[in-house]
């Protein structure tokens, strides 16, 4: 099955909640991770939200995050670099539950990190969704447009 693909604009409501696009929520239902039944991830499913170094937020389904979490858990607490990586990863991570309307709450810390106060752009990026403040995303895209061909040539 195809992952998350596409781009949508949504608004953060006055309580800091973000509506997950219906087409992305349908992907959860198809995968069985958001069927409305009680589970360890809440009645309507959950997402892992991570702050990123580029100023965006990444949203992962539990099944995707579990694979990443296993890799992180395998790092040694006795190796200073590996322990630092664990600390940095978990410091920027939250798990949030979807409500009946398909919204997730975003903490003030995460909203401030991403510069979000109103409208957002949600990009489907295969195994994750990336949430951007629109002007910040436009700045990244405009500032990198000349690099697209070189990057694509290098990796494809």
Swiss-Prot record:
**InterPro entries attached here?**
MraZ, MraZ_C, MraZ_dom, MraZ_N, MraZ_sf, SpoVT-AbrB_dom, SpoVT-AbrB_sf
Name of this chain's protein: Transcriptional regulator MraZ
Per the UniProt entry, the signal peptide is none
Its quaternary organisation is:
Forms oligomers.
Give GO terms: molecular function aspect only. DNA-binding transcription factor activity; transcription cis-regulatory region binding
Alphabetized, the UniProt keywords read: Cytoplasm, DNA-binding, Repeat, Transcription, Transcription regulation
Give a yes or no for keyword Transcription regulation in this entry. yes
Domain SpoVT-AbrB, which positions? Answer: 7-64, 93-136
Q: Which family does it belong to?
A: Belongs to the MraZ family.
What's the source species for this entry?
Chlorobium phaeovibrioides (strain DSM 265 / 1930)
HAMAP family associated with the record: MraZ
Which taxonomic lineage does the organism of this UniProt entry have? Bacteria, Pseudomonadati, Chlorobiota, Chlorobiia, Chlorobiales
Where does it live in the cell?
Cytoplasm, Nucleoid
- Tell me a GO biological process for this protein: negative regulation of DNA-templated transcription initiation
Q: Could you give one GO CC term from the UniProt record?
A: cytoplasm
């Amino acid at each position: 099955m195809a992952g998350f693909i596409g781009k949508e604009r949504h608004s953060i409501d006055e309580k800091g909640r973000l509506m997950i696009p219906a087409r992305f929520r349908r992907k959860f239902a198809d995968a069985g991770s958001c069927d409305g039944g009680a589970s360890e991830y809440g009645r309507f499913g959950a997402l892992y939200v991570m702050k990123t170094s580029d100023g965006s937020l990444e949203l992962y389904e539990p099944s995707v995050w579990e694979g990443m979490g296993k890799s992180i858990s395998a790092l040694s607490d006795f190796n200073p670099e590996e322990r630092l990586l664990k600390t940095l990863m978990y410091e920027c991570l939250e798990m949030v539950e979807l409500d009946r309307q398909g919204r997730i709450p975003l903490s003030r810390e995460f909203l401030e990190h991403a510069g979000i106060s109103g409208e957002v752009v949600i990009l489907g990026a295969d195994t994750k969704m990336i949430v951007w403040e629109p002007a910040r995303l436009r700045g990244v895209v405009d500032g990198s447009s000349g690099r697209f061909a070189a990057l694509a040539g290098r990796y494809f």
